[in-house]
């Protein structure tokens, strides 16, 4: 870790705990995560009228979860789960919703019939997911991101 030497044991423990949390927060089939979730990984479904609406969807702020999983693997390669998860994310978008406009999704992949507000961010997220992916789609989004 790149922290002060006296803080490294704490940050190493925090990184390990964060990786374990993500295994709970990311959906077992799609790899998607909600914007907000409880400590047990369950999507936060309350207060849907606060902070602009629902936060139990794969939407906006949750894109960075997938991006950060890619970055964590690129820097540390500490857990092969990162690769498994990001392969699921890319498979979801490339097989389940191939050639469709990006929408808002529940983390199980259910489509919310509203357009994604940040489609370029979704392309960039899927490209960054490739840092921790080895599936058949890992190069597709990197070229898509370069085209944007």
Where are these regions (language model features)?
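Extended ligand-binding clefts on enzyme/binding-domain cores
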Residues: 1-138
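Conserved small/polar residues in nucleotide/adenosyl-binding loops
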Residues: 141-148
């Amino acid at each position: 870790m790149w922290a002060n030497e006296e803080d490294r044991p704490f940050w190493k423990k925090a990184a390990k705990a964060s990786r374990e949390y993500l295994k709970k927060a990311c959906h077992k089939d799609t790899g998607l995560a909600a914007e907000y979730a409880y400590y047990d990984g369950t999507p936060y479904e309350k207060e849907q009228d606060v902070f602009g609406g629902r936060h139990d969807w794969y939407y906006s702020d949750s894109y960075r979860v997938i991006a950060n999983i890619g970055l964590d693997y690129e820097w540390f390669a500490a857990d092969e789960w990162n690769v498994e998860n990001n392969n699921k994310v890319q498979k979801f978008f490339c097989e389940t919703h191939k050639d469709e406009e990006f929408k808002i999704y529940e983390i199980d992949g259910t489509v919310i019939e509203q357009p994604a507000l940040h489609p370029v961010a979704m392309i960039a997220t899927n490209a960054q997911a490739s840092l921790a992916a080895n599936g058949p789609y890992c190069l597709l989004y990197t070229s898509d991101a370069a085209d944007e």
